[in-house]
Amino acid sequence: MLGVNKGEVILVTHSENWKRLFDKEKSLLETIIGEQVKDIQQFGSTAIKGIEAKPIIDILVGVESLKDVEKFNNERLKEAGYYHLSRVQIDGKEVFAKFTDLENLTKTHILHVVEYQGDWWNEHISFRDYLNANPLVSKEYESLKKNLAEKYPNDEHSYTNEKKQFVDEILNEM
């Protein structure tokens, strides 16, 4: 299963298929926006071995400058199912989502476009790598995610905000 409807919080068992799906998407993105991109990495819970995750592939796209987003071929991105979420206002980040169902707003992939090796880039990569290197911490994170998914099954915003405290604590320890 890949994809979650807008606002829903659903966790599924980790799938080895997520890496293959990321690799396929990375190749597609390189043909569409590759000229402006320094690196493309999978991150988020689908990139952490052995833990449950929302079945959405988070993709980190590193660019020299966020102004490079203006050079993206938005028409080709839309043809591939990606839409720029211009209403998502996060300082230092531009967000695109791939939808397989526009009626239910079913997201399968989220592109987080950030400055390559800037703060966002380094934090996302460091957190992923730390959890993959520390299975006990990744299981603690999984437990938190399960509790929050039960608490907020239809409130993705609250789910994400409460997870942030754990992420920030880990990043501060590193």
Swiss-Prot record:
InterPro entries: GrpB/CoaE, NT_sf. It comes from the Bacteria. The keyword Membrane does not apply. Keywords: Plasmid. Signal peptide: none annotated. SUPFAM superfamilies: Nucleotidyltransferase. Pfam families: GrpB (PF04229). Belongs to the UPF0157 (GrpB) family. This is Glutamate-rich protein GrpB. The gene is grpB.
